[in-house]
Amino acid sequence: MKSISCGKEYTEDVRNINIRPEQLDDFVGQKDLIQNLKVFINAAQTRTEALDHVLLYGPPGLGKTTLAQIVSKELRVSFRATSGPLLSKAGDLAAVLTTLNAKDVLFIDEIHRLNRSIEEVLYTAMEDFCLDILVGEGPSTRTLRIDLPPFTLIGATTRLGLLSAPLRDRFGIPLHLEFYSFEELVNIIKRGARVLSAEIEEDAAREIACRARGTPRIALRLLRRIRDFVEVKDDKKITYEVADSVLLKLGVDKMGLNKLDMNYLRFLFNTSGPVGIDTISIALSEDVGNIEETVEPYLIKISFVKRTPRGRVLTDQAKEYLSFQH
C-alpha cells in the first residue's frame, strides 16, 4: 500500500522531467543550431569517433543543459554532469575525467567559473586526452601522465566573455542559443501542458508565451504555477482569464517584466545620464552578475535598455512604457 500512496508524487516527478525533450527532432526552437548539431553528430558516428567538444552559450533558461543531455542520448553514450564551482582543484577534475569511458559526454555547467589552474589541466585533457598530475613534493616532485579515452566535453555558460581565450578556442563546436520566438514558446507550453495532463486553451497558452521573456524555462515555470492555482480551485482547464489573473498575482506584467526589472527601469528613469553597472548593483542591492545575466539580456532584446561606453541608458520606448505604469 505504501508504494501506491507514493505513486502520485512519483508520477508528478516523472512528468516534470519529461517536459524536457529527449531527442533533437522533438526540440522546439534553435532551428539552425539543431540542424548543424545533427550533422556534427552523424559525422562523428559515421567515423566512429567522439564528437568534438561543444560550447553552448547564451542567456539562462534557453536549453543548454537539455541539449547536452540530448546529445549524449543521440550518441548513445553515458552522460556525466558537474559545474565549474564544484571543480575547485585538479584532483576534482581528475576524479571526474578518470571515470569516463570512450566517447562519453562530460557536461560542465557554468564553465566560466573554473579557476585558471583547473583550466590548464583541462587543456591537455581536451586536446591530447591525457592528464598530467604532479606527484610528490619538493625535489622529488614528478609528473604522472594518465591516458584518457576520447570523450566529448560540453561546456555551458551564460557569460562567454568570462571564458579565457585559450579555453574558448579549444571547443571545436561553439553554439549560440538565442531567445525563442513567440510561436515557439506557444508550442513548448502546449507540449508541457500535455505532459502535465493539464488542459489549456489556445488564448491561455499565448498569454503565457507573451510573458515568458523568450525563455522556455520561464514559460514552463509559469505554466506549473498556473496549474497549481487551477488544481487548488478545482477548475477543469487553464483559460485566458485564469492565466492572466495568476500571472498578475505572481508579479509578471504584460511584457513579462517582474519587480526587479521594474526597479531597474525606474532607477534608470530617475537618474540623469548613463549609469554604470556597479552603481545599479548598489542601488538595487543585487549582484552585478545577476543583473547582467538575468535582467539586462531581455531588456536589451525588447529595446528598453542600451549599453553604452559610459553606462546603461533607457530608450524612449522604455520611458513611454513606464509612463503608463502606476
Swiss-Prot record:
Name its cellular compartments.
Cytoplasm
What is one term from the GO cellular component aspect held by the record?
Holliday junction resolvase complex
Q: Which SMART domains match?
A: AAA
EC numbers on record: 3.6.4.-
Q: CDD domains per the record?
A: AAA
What's a GO biological-process term for it? DNA recombination
Q: Which InterPro entries match?
A: AAA+_ATPase, AAA_lid_4, DNA_helicase_Holl-junc_RuvB, P-loop_NTPase, RuvB-like_N, RuvB_C, WH-like_DNA-bd_sf, WH_DNA-bd_sf
Which residues of the sequence carry a binding annotation for Mg(2+)?
Answer: T65
Q: Region annotation Head domain (RuvB-H): residue ranges?
A: 254-326
Keyword DNA repair appears in the UniProt entry = yes
Q: Which residues make up the binding site for DNA?
A: R307, R312
Question: Could you tell me which residues belong to the region Large ATPase domain (RuvB-L)?
Answer: 1-180
Looking at the record, which segments are called Small ATPAse domain (RuvB-S)?
181-251
The UniProt entry, under Gene3D superfamilies, shows:
1.10.8.60, P-loop containing nucleotide triphosphate hydrolases, Winged helix-like DNA-binding domain superfamily/Winged helix DNA-binding domain
Q: Which residues make up the binding site for ATP?
A: I19, R20, G61, K64, T65, T66, E127, D128, F129, R170, Y180, R217
Family statement: Belongs to the RuvB family.
- Per its database record, what is this protein's job? The RuvA-RuvB-RuvC complex processes Holliday junction (HJ) DNA during genetic recombination and DNA repair, while the RuvA-RuvB complex plays an important role in the rescue of blocked DNA replication forks via replication fork reversal (RFR). RuvA specifically binds to HJ cruciform DNA, conferring on it an open structure. The RuvB hexamer acts as an ATP-dependent pump, pulling dsDNA into and through the RuvAB complex. RuvB forms 2 homohexamers on either side of HJ DNA bound by 1 or 2 RuvA tetramers; 4 subunits per hexamer contact DNA at a time.
How it assembles, according to the record, is:
Homohexamer. Forms an RuvA(8)-RuvB(12)-Holliday junction (HJ) complex. HJ DNA is sandwiched between 2 RuvA tetramers; dsDNA enters through RuvA and exits via RuvB. An RuvB hexamer assembles on each DNA strand where it exits the tetramer. Each RuvB hexamer is contacted by two RuvA subunits (via domain III) on 2 adjacent RuvB subunits; this complex drives branch migration. In the full resolvosome a probable DNA-RuvA(4)-RuvB(12)-RuvC(2) complex forms which resolves the HJ.
Q: What is the recorded name of this protein? A: Holliday junction branch migration complex subunit RuvB
Organism the protein comes from: Wolbachia pipientis wMel
- Organism classification, top ranks? Bacteria, Pseudomonadati, Pseudomonadota, Alphaproteobacteria, Rickettsiales
The gene from which this protein is expressed is: ruvB
